[in-house]
UniProtKB/Swiss-Prot annotation:
GO terms for cellular component: cytoplasm. InterPro entries: Trp_synth_b_CS (IPR006653), Trp_synth_beta (IPR006654), Trp_synth_beta/beta-like (IPR023026), TrpB-like_PALP (IPR001926), TrpB-like_PALP_sf (IPR036052). The modification N6-(pyridoxal phosphate)lysine is found at residue 110. It comes from Prochlorococcus marinus (strain NATL2A). Tetramer of two alpha and two beta chains. Pathway: Amino-acid biosynthesis; L-tryptophan biosynthesis; L-tryptophan from chorismate: step 5/5. Keywords: Amino-acid biosynthesis, Aromatic amino acid biosynthesis, Lyase, Pyridoxal phosphate, Tryptophan biosynthesis. This is Tryptophan synthase beta chain. Pfam families: PALP. Gene3D superfamilies: 3.40.50.1100. One of its GO terms (molecular function) is tryptophan synthase activity. The beta subunit is responsible for the synthesis of L-tryptophan from indole and L-serine. It catalyses: (1S,2R)-1-C-(indol-3-yl)glycerol 3-phosphate + L-serine = D-glyceraldehyde 3-phosphate + L-tryptophan + H2O. HAMAP family: Trp_synth_beta (MF_00133).
Length: 417
């Protein structure tokens, strides 16, 4: 498949399981908690998206670029040695498949959304683009599409994340983007998002904010999900070709939750498919130094949406911690909160140490170095595989490659580069 969002997912009359209501809510989650200045821009964006999906020329251009520029469709790869590792001569353990989003142009799933939103920005006449980034992959993807279309690009990135992801900072600059360090708060993704929103409020007439996850005010959770839905739709077709049916389990890491939502969306109404999101437990959930928002969070409002958040007893947003810059966020997309509440999706958390061990294992067994974010999903196989039988099929969203994380992993392992 080379296409974008399938036609059956554009219909506003879909079940509320797979679509927010007219107020932009998934159950009680979501909404628009933003300054009045931004409401017209959000209305304009939602309307532009609705019109674009109905426009054959928009879909044709997006499909063409997804195929020739991004490199879609991405393969569904059978991880035979990883499968053998977890079976260990027993009848337990599933067959493991990887949805190779790491093979996209720029090395992650992020470009699916960045490309789609850039085309919408052009459609709306907005030539100045801003974005937030944590691990740098969304920043690189945004800078890439801005270079492709000749758009001004400003990326907000926490100073701590710039230190951890120096390679991606230079990549963004090489692509012509202005990378603006954020020093407030923990100098990570939450603070970068806050600065991007402040910029947008000031420059809303000329600027489009390419938000990088299924978070933020409506219509962003829906919009970002829709641009990533191609992941799950390809997976559904590829599974039927590979083993004749839908998978038993879908597994993906969750920070804000865009890669997981892109994989899950096509399967939400198929109750035979388990959907599992894996959060960052950091130093351990019990230590308080983690980013396990769904596991430990409470309902609150952050960055324009109501969702589960990490909060202290007074309701103040707490600092998140993860070795992975892309998961180091104290909130989560509202649709994930909703899927958890209604019992449709499951969520677990793994530690920094477990993620690094999984990254090394996958690298040595499959010759694929996953991103630290993705490594959290791989790490959960240790607990999941012994519970699944030999005939089970599991698909992991390999959301990004780990080149950007080599220095961080080397430092953690005590190696010098």
């Amino acid at each position: 498949m080379t296409g974008t969002l399938p036609t059956q997912f554009k219909d506003s009359d879909l079940s509320p399981l797979t679509r927010p209501n007219t107020l932009g809510r998934f159950g009680k989650y979501g909404g628009q908690y933003v300054p009045e200045t931004l409401i017209p821009a959000l209305i304009e964006l939602e309307q532009a998206a609705k019109e674009a999906w109905k426009d054959s020329s928009f879909n044709s251009e997006l499909n063409h670029l997804l195929k020739t520029y991004v490199g879609r469709s991405t393969p569904l790869y059978e991880a035979t040695r990883l499968t053998e590792h977890y079976r260990k001569n027993t009848l337990k353990g599933p067959r493991i498949w990887l949805k190779r989003e790491d093979l996209n142009h720029t090395g992650a799933h992020k470009i699916n959304n960045a490309l789609g939103q850039a085309l919408l920005a052009i459609r709306m006449g907005k030539k100045r683009i801003i974005a937030e980034t944590g691990a740098g992959q969304h920043g690189v993807a945004t800078a890439t599409v801005c270079a492709r279309f000749g758009l001004e690009c400003i990326i907000y990135m926490g100073k701590e994340d710039m230190r951890r992801q120096a390679l991606n900072v230079f990549r963004m600059q090489l692509l012509g983007a202005s990378v603006r360090p954020v020093t407030s708060g923990t100098a990570t993704l939450k603070d970068a998002t806050s600065e991007a929103i402040r910029d947008w409020v000031t420059n809303v007439e000329t600027t489009h904010y390419i938000l990088g996850s299924v978070a933020g005010p409506h219509p962003y959770p829906m919009l970002v999900r829709d641009f990533h839905a191609v992941i799950g739709e390809e997976t559904k077709q590829q599974c039927k070709q590979a083993f004749g049916r839908s998978p038993d389990v879908l597994l993906a890491c969750v920070g804000g939750g865009s890669n997981a939502m892109g994989l899950f969306h096509s399967f939400v109404e198929d109750k035979s498919v388990r959907m599992i999101g894996v959060e960052a437990a950091g130093d351990g959930v019990e230590t308080g130094r983690h980013a396990a928002t769904i596991t430990e969070g409470r309902i609150g409002v952050l960055h324009g949406a109501m969702s589960l958040l990490l909060q202290d007893k007074d309701g103040q947003v707490e600092e998140a911690h993860s070795i992975s810059a892309g998961l180091d966020y104290p909130g989560v997309g509202p649709e994930h909160s909703y899927l958890k509440e209604i019992g449709r999706a499951e969520y677990a958390a793994v530690t920094d140490t477990e993620a690094i061990e999984a990254l090394q294992l996958v690298s040595k067994l499959e010759g694929i170095i996953p991103a630290l974010e993705t490594a959290h999903a791989f790490a959960y196989l240790e607990k999941l595989c012994p519970t699944l039988n030999h005939n089970s099929e599991i698909v992991i969203n390999c959301s990004g490659r780990g080149d950007k994380d080599v220095n961080t992993v080397a430092e953690k392992l005590g190696s010098e580069i």
